């Protein structure tokens, strides 16, 4: 694996010079191998190690290099034709392979090659970009978008129209991460490498980026870039220091543990916020 990483790192330093016409065989094979490993879930752009999320920047570099070495080509679709550098993940799937991998794909869901989809996942008409990782038992609902290299945990529900941001550029940015057992409400957006920790519930229409204030009304604490585990979050506003105006924020209205969450439905958690 170290040799593969070295090839990617070296090629990335001269990426501006690389084109589909002049890409050398070693680089091309290394990039294709990484994309295949991401596609199968054998590698992932970010993983939790000793309780901390670690981003493997060289894998993101490999994804970026894939755009340098591959030319656009016609991609056949059921209702149209497309022209892109990245093939579709399911282009060569047959019924046996779908049965083996154990997930459902509802038309016209689109998944790019290099994204991993785990067993018992349901993809409604949605979009999953290259480098993303969608873990077991997750529902990606209608018109939801999972951005490049985003990490989605087990038993997550991404409701209709949810946007999970991609972060291939800038390279130092970490991917957006939704941990296990989270619920993201309809039309909410989580972007810019924000981490939504395990068991959190995000209400409909909540927008969270790195600069969004995440206000815990119980403690008065303000978080940035991280929703603490077990949070129930709604959209709100905080007043300016001079009291002349207010600005958008996300508000943690309560905290729930796994036991409470198991007994009480998502709708009940969101309705009883007073």
UniProtKB/Swiss-Prot annotation:
Substrate binds at residues 104, 141. It comes from the Bacteria. Homotrimer. Belongs to the transferase hexapeptide repeat family. GO terms for biological process: diaminopimelate biosynthetic process; lysine biosynthetic process via diaminopimelate. It holds the Pfam family Hexapep_2. NCBIfam families: dapD (TIGR00965), PRK11830.1 (NF008808). Pathway: Amino-acid biosynthesis; L-lysine biosynthesis via DAP pathway; LL-2,6-diaminopimelate from (S)-tetrahydrodipicolinate (succinylase route): step 1/3. The gene is dapD. GO terms for molecular function: 2,3,4,5-tetrahydropyridine-2,6-dicarboxylate N-succinyltransferase activity; nucleotidyltransferase activity. Keywords: Acyltransferase, Amino-acid biosynthesis, Cytoplasm, Diaminopimelate biosynthesis, Lysine biosynthesis, Repeat, Transferase. It is found in: Cytoplasm. Its main location: cytoplasm. It comes from Escherichia coli O6:H1 (strain CFT073 / ATCC 700928 / UPEC). This is 2,3,4,5-tetrahydropyridine-2,6-dicarboxylate N-succinyltransferase. It catalyses: (S)-2,3,4,5-tetrahydrodipicolinate + succinyl-CoA + H2O = (S)-2-succinylamino-6-oxoheptanedioate + CoA. Its EC number is 2.3.1.117. GO terms for cellular component: cytoplasm. It is an enzyme of class 2 (transferase). InterPro entries: DapD_Trfase_Hexpep_rpt_fam, Hexapep, Hexapep_transf_CS, THP_succinylTrfase_dom1, THP_succinylTrfase_N_sf, Trimer_LpxA-like_sf.
């Amino acid at each position: 694996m170290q040799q593969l990483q070295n090839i990617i790192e070296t090629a990335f330093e001269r990426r501006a010079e690389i084109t589909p016409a002049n890409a050398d065989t070693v680089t091309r094979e290394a990039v294709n191998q990484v994309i295949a490993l991401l596609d199968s879930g054998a590698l992932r752009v970010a993983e939790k190690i000793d309780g901390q999320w670690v981003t493997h920047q060289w894998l993101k570099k490999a994804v970026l290099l894939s755009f340098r070495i591959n030319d656009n080509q016609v991609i056949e679709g059921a209702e149209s034709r497309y022209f892109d550098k990245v093939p579709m993940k399911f282009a060569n799937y047959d019924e046996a392979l779908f049965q083996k991998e154990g997930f459902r794909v509802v038309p016209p869901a689109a998944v790019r090659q290099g994204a991993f989809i785990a067993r018992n996942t349901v993809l409604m008409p949605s979009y999953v970009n290259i480098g993303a990782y969608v873990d077991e038992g997750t529902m990606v609902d209608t018109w939801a978008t999972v951005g490049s290299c985003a990490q989605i945990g087990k038993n997550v529900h991404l409701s209709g129209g949810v946007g999970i941001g991609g972060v291939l550029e800038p390279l130092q940015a970490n991917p957006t991460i939704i941990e296990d057992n989270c619920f993201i409400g309809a039309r909410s957006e989580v972007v810019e490498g924000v981490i939504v920790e395990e068991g959190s519930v995000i209400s409909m229409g909540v927008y969270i980026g790195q600069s969004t204030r995440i206000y815990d009304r119980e403690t008065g604490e303000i978080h940035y870039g991280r929703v603490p585990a077990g949070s129930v979050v709604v959209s709100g506003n905080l007043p300016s220091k001079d009291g002349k105006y207010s600005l958008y924020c996300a508000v943690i209205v309560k905290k729930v543990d796994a036991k409470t969450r198991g007994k009480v439905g998502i709708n009940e958690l969101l309705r009883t916020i007073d």
